[in-house]
Curated annotation (Swiss-Prot):
One of its GO terms (biological process) is transmembrane transport. This is Putative transport protein sll0060. The lineage of its organism: Bacteria, Bacillati, Cyanobacteriota, Cyanophyceae, Synechococcales. Keywords: Cell membrane, Membrane, Transmembrane, Transmembrane helix, Transport. It is a multi-pass membrane protein. It comes from Synechocystis sp. (strain ATCC 27184 / PCC 6803 / Kazusa). GO terms for cellular component: plasma membrane. InterPro entries: AI-2E-like. The keyword Hydrolase does not apply. It is found in: Cell membrane. Belongs to the autoinducer-2 exporter (AI-2E) (TC 2.A.86) family.
Length: 344
């Protein structure tokens, strides 16, 4: 085979055919390594994510007030601790009260929902539409307590894991501080392992992928959550804080905002059909204003990854590393796409 004289198209497909099996084999080996070193890798990834987010205010303090790096890091960590403490003291007690209220109202909401479904059945019978909303409602009602118990058990396990992982949390904090102070030299050493022609491009693409995704998703989630809390409170919707924080948290994940809006609307409709419609209308308007009005002007292009690849990367990330895999799946997919576009 005369490689230099091959047509460019054939050469490209031959290169893909030769490298694809090697990539799959290396990927399988990488999965085994990730599974074996799960705990230290989890500490490393979380510390890097926290340092990546806190690095922005640190660099800002170095640039404008011209603080030295250790003082900037100390100020950012202290400010973050104060903000978390204030949120814990002011928001969490009210949030816990609203969660307790929802749990106490579950039997009542179940009965109300059954009556609403009966009304829908009667209406559909008048129009001679073959439906059986009550049967569907009973199936959901029978399954709902099981899901609540499952979620409760998961929360208890999470609390046990949190109590037993204080050492891990300490390692995360220490590594975060070191990455804020000496992260530049650490990554310089990592990227020296790459070929000279790749170093700058890989580093730039990797930073841009994570930066675009996390800044974009965090901005949209914060704007959506705060705007929804304010809007629902203005219209005197019960559980406005719980609904707004839930939607804001879910909006950090792709497709989470719309899914959570539908979910809170269904929960509100168990109390009153008009309340559910009201919540759906308010949340939809706020979501459209944030995602189609404010977010594009503030963020522009975020990842550019096709929705199908987003779903696939989320499923793969969840399979490989659970919630942590979901958090890093989209920026990694964006990075891989950019690198393939550059080198293929």
């Amino acid at each position: 085979m005369n490689w230099p004289n091959m047509p460019p198209g054939d050469r490209r497909w031959l290169w893909i055919g030769l490298t694809l099996p090697l990539c799959l084999l290396n990927g399988w080996v990488l999965l085994q390594i990730l599974d074996y070193f799960q705990s230290p890798l989890r500490i490393f990834i979380i510390a890097n994510l926290v340092a990546f987010i806190l690095g922005y205010p640190v660099r800002w303090l170095q640039r404008y007030p011209r603080l030295k790096l250790p003082y900037a890091v100390a100020l950012v960590l202290l400010t973050t601790a104060i903000i978390l403490a204030v949120i814990g003291l002011l928001v969490i007690p009210k949030l816990v009260d609203q969660i307790r209220t929802v749990l106490q109202l579950l039997p009542h909401l179940n009965a109300l929902g059954d009556r609403h479904l009966e009304s829908l059945d009667n209406l559909s019978n008048q129009w001679e539409i073959p439906t059986n909303f009550r049967a569907w409602g009973r199936e959901l009602s029978n399954e709902f307590p099981n899901q609540i118990r499952s979620i409760t058990n998961q929360l208890i396990n999470l609390l046990i894991w949190t109590a037993g992982s204080l050492v891990e949390a300490g390692f995360i904090f220490i590594m975060t501080v070191y990455l804020l102070l000496r992260g530049q030299t650490f990554w310089d050493g990592i990227f020296r392992w790459l070929p000279i022609d790749w170093r700058h491009k890989v580093r730039q693409r990797l930073r841009h992928s994570f930066q675009n995704y996390y800044i974009g998703q965090a901005t949209v989630a914060a704007l959506l959550g705060v705007s929804l809390i304010i809007s629902l409170s203005i219209f005197q919707v019960p559980l406005a804080l719980l609904f707004g924080m839930f939607v804001g948290f879910m909006a950090f994940f792709p497709f989470g905002g719309g899914t959570s809006i539908v979910l809170i609307s269904i929960i509100a409709s168990f109390q009153s059909i008009w309340l559910g419609i009201k919540v759906l209308a308010i949340a939809t308007v706020v979501d459209q204003v944030v995602e189609n009005g404010l977010a594009p002007k503030l963020l522009g292009r975020v990842t550019g990854v096709h929705p199908v690849w987003i779903l696939l990367s989320l499923m793969i990330g969840a399979k490989v590393a659970g919630l942590l895999g979901i958090l890093v799946a989209i920026p990694i997919a964006s990075f891989i796409r950019d690198m393939l576009n550059d080198f293929i």
